[in-house]
Amino acid sequence: MVRLSTKPPNPKVEMNLKEPPITGAGAGAAASPPAPSTLRRNPPRSARPPPTPLPNSKPSQISRLLEEAAERLKVFLRIRPLPLPERKGKAKSPTNPKQVCLVANSPNSVALTVPHSKLLDPKRGRTEVFDGFSSVFSPDSSQHDVFSQVMNPLVDDLLLGGKSGLLVAMGPTGSGKTHTVFGSPRNPGLVPLTLRRIFSPTTHEPFSKLRSFCFSMFEILSEGKGERILDLLSDATDLVLQQSTIKGLKEVSVENFADAEALLFSGMLKRTTAATNANSKSSRSQCIITIRAVHKSSDAESENSLNNAVLTIADLAGAERERRTGNQGTRLLESNFINNTSMVFGLCLRSLLEHQKNKKKPLEKHFKNSMLTRYLRDYLEGRKKMTLILNVKPGDDDYLDTSFLLRQASPYMKIKYTNLEDSSGLVSQKRSSASLICQENTKKRKIHKVAGKDDIDKDDGVTISEKDESQYKLLNSELRRVSRNEEIMTNFARALWTVLKQYKQKLLESENAVESTRELLRSKDIKIMELEKKLKVLSCSCKKFPAVEDTFVEQNNDVSSGQVAQSFVSLSSQTDLVSIDSALNKSLAVEEVSEESTGHGPERSSDYDDKTGTGGSDVCDTSIIKLIAEEELCSGDCKPEKASSSDAFIPEHDVEKENIGIVVQVLDKKLDRSESCSDGGGVTHSSSSLDHPSDQSFTDTCLQNESANLSPQFIGASKKSPIEQSEEEREEIHNITTEGIQQNVHTRGVKHHSTPSCSQEVNSGSLHVSSSQLQGMGALQQDPQSERCKPTVEITIVEYGCAQPPHVVDDHGGMYPCTLNGKSSPRKAPISPTKDNQAEKLTDKIEDLSASKPCNRKNTRRRLQPVSAMMLKEFTGPDIFVDTRKEEKVKSSRDAMGRSDKLIRLLTDHPPRARGRAQ
């Protein structure tokens, strides 16, 4: 290097240099010029010549062999292309540091750039360069490019050299390891391409027809906190790892590529995979594929060279970060297993590197911590050749995983393999140039070794045979025990099955018995119901009153209190009249029933009658009648006599009429001859017929009193109307109720001086009274012990359809209102005095009127009759002769009113005489 000065030059020096030198006489006269001045420069330096090698110096053969044998571990790096969603919306240049953190600088090196999100100071960028890779595959590289550089050397060693080889795919989860190893049907990976290369015969493979290949495939996965081996080509689960071999592993001999490919894809379907947040199809196990070459000939040399040649391909599960995957439970245990296996594998390689650097440092036995490293022990200890292919992702989000893998794998490139398996050939070459003595010594040593090996083999065979025999005995005893237990369990199962069948049969029988019992109970219940019905019918017939459904009474909407009394009198008329006390008790009971049925008193019935002008009243429950009838039957001293079997029915209902009339007819027109009390105490027989215009009446006054006591309508009539009414008032009442039908029914009593007499009013609406009943009644009338029959004759007048109360004529001929149960109205003065001859004349007039023919009446529309009308119609005596059916068809309502008024006037002016005097 020449360094130049920076000072300006001297002008005098320059002039001296420019002026030419003076010669001749002028030169002598002038002074001699000074010596010229020159610049000082550094002298040139010559380099030392390189040392020349000695003419006879050559590298030794041993060092050359060791240098060739010292083959390094090959490490390949493949960068996965970015996924399609990440490519959209980004720059076209893939080297953009903001989006891609890993870039290939050369075929053997890559540059890793820290993303801006990870930098503490964004202004200062940081880039790391990792070199020394055997090859770096860019994202655009194909599967065939990877196969040609990675797998071709291993396949050549297997086919041509008979050497074993191992390919391990490592990398984080989702980096493309499985795709690189297996590929897809359209883009096959390294394993399918290897099988295709093996089973495609070529000219440079002279041993292709003399050997076969065995294919096996298994995986190592986690089981709880442990590990287990699963065969992917069979369903066997009992696989045991013994040193570097797997006991029970199925090896399938394949002859062509199609069979091998079918086995490969069937094993892929059984592989354990799962979805995580980082990868949708994440491998959860370490998958290992082995291809073993087997020689077919009997040549010992070729067999020895090919027996142990195995090509192994391992697809390791990717390391996972818990924060990115979000695994929990079983997936978290699987992540721990995967990360632990990757860590142990890296520790084994680092221990091998340190041991090669320092021979004094022993080799750590990290391979014992994992089942995968135990199986690959020969490769991890440097005795067999191994190749690594690292798969990484270039995205900014994957910077941590990529940097960790590159830092971990960068030292592995310095690992060397001495390849001790192939050193025997080199040793044989050295022996050929050795002395004969050494050769003889070597032969002797070999002979001694072979003899020792034979002895050892014999001893081992003896010990193995002894062990096999003891094991055989043990297994035989175990087999007998298991067979005995199986027989016992079979017999027990049969016995249990028989017992279950018996219990099932018994259960069916019991169910059938229960069903039959239920049917029997149902049939008995039906019989009981039928018997109860029959019992009710018989009880009704025994009590001498018809059932509720046998009584037919037509009424508009409700039943009057008169009907209640009618039913009660009908029932009570069938019993024997023992005494007047019983009659009084009966009248009181009937009065209570009538008050309850008519709205708690006669006032309600009177109001209702005044409003409607008809005989309707509240509905009375027939059950009350039944209860009263039962009490009468039970309280009587004598049993009731059997009544004649005659039914009461209701006449036809006239549709044209607005109101309904109640007419009770007796089917039997002729009654049996009955007995009645006469003047001399004898019995008189009389025949009664409804069609006849005049009927004979009972002359017993006691019977009339009892009939009056038994009819509650008399009480209502006496309470509803005043004691006396004038003729003008009666005419006004008749004019108001012109449309209704009114009748006056006069009950006449005959006075007996000699013996006490009783009277009974026979109701035409009730059942017929037989002759036996009448005879019993006559006997009671003649009984001298009956002290309650009064000797006087009382004539009770009952008005039907009129508001005037009934009157009674005393002994002196005076009239006073009728009383019930000893109760009379406050006004007791006689209305008009009468005499016996007047009574005689009145009786004759009544007989003439009853004997005369009734006038024809027009068919008129009838309304409901008042309570008093219905009561008097029901309690009409036998000596009142009224033909109801003919009167309805012949007479009009106004004519009937006129005739009834005349009869009332005759009765009031001329009281009737005793029938006995007339006779």
From Swiss-Prot:
Pfam families assigned: Kinesin
Biased composition (Low complexity): 28-45, 685-697
Residue span, Kinesin motor domain: 72-415
Keywords linked to the UniProt accession: ATP-binding, Microtubule, Motor protein, Nucleotide-binding
Molecular function terms from GO: ATP binding; ATP hydrolysis activity; microtubule binding; microtubule motor activity
Keyword Cell membrane: no
Biological-process GO terms, alphabetical: microtubule-based movement
Sequence similarity: Belongs to the TRAFAC class myosin-kinesin ATPase superfamily. Kinesin family. KIN-6 subfamily.
Listed name of the protein: Kinesin-like protein KIN-6
Organism, as annotated: Oryza sativa subsp. japonica
Protein's gene: KIN6
